[in-house]
């Protein structure tokens, strides 16, 4: 899978969390959000907090690898989390994830 990082960096407004994770909001309409997560390769293992998805979550791993309590998802994986699912994702390597939250996200 090829990702044009130069285009992404030129067109996405990033919010830095100071943990090696940054969030780019691509679109928001009512409670639905489409975002990018960009994670550095040497991020702390607990950079992501446990969180809940009231309306579920779908994400595509564009680069790197994501893993959580339910499995490991390499580049190219499309992952669906059902309504009211709680998880604590982790990443391996430089990771870029495209995420859709139909009804937002809440800290667990």
Name the predicted role of every residue range.
Residues 1-5, 69, 108:
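Cytosolic regulatory regions built on CNB/CRP/Popeye-like sensor folds
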Residues 56-58, 94-95:
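Short, surface-exposed beta-edge/turn micro-motifs
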Residues 1-34:
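A short, N-terminal "cap"/entry segment at the start of jelly-roll beta-barrel domains
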Residues 77-78, 96:
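Residue-level marker of beta-strand positions
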Residues 18, 72, 83-108:
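Ligand-binding loop in jelly-roll beta-barrel domains
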Residues 57-59, 64-68, 78:
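Short beta-strand segments in beta-sandwich/barrel cores
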Residues 22-53, 67, 71-75, 82-86:
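Conserved short histidine dyad/triad with adjacent acidic residue
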């Amino acid at each position: 899978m090829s990702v044009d990082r130069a285009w992404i960096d030129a067109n996405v407004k990033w919010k830095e969390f100071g943990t090696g994770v940054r969030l780019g909001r691509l679109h928001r309409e009512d409670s639905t959000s489409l975002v990018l997560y960009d994670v550095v390769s040497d991020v702390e293992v607990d950079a992501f907090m446990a969180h809940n998805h009231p309306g579920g979550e779908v994400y595509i791993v564009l680069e790197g690898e994501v893993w959580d309590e339910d499995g490991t998802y390499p580049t190219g994986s499309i992952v669906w989390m059902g309504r009211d699912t709680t998880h604590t994702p982790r990443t391996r390597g430089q990771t870029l994830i495209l995420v859709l939250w139909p009804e937002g996200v809440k800290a667990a």
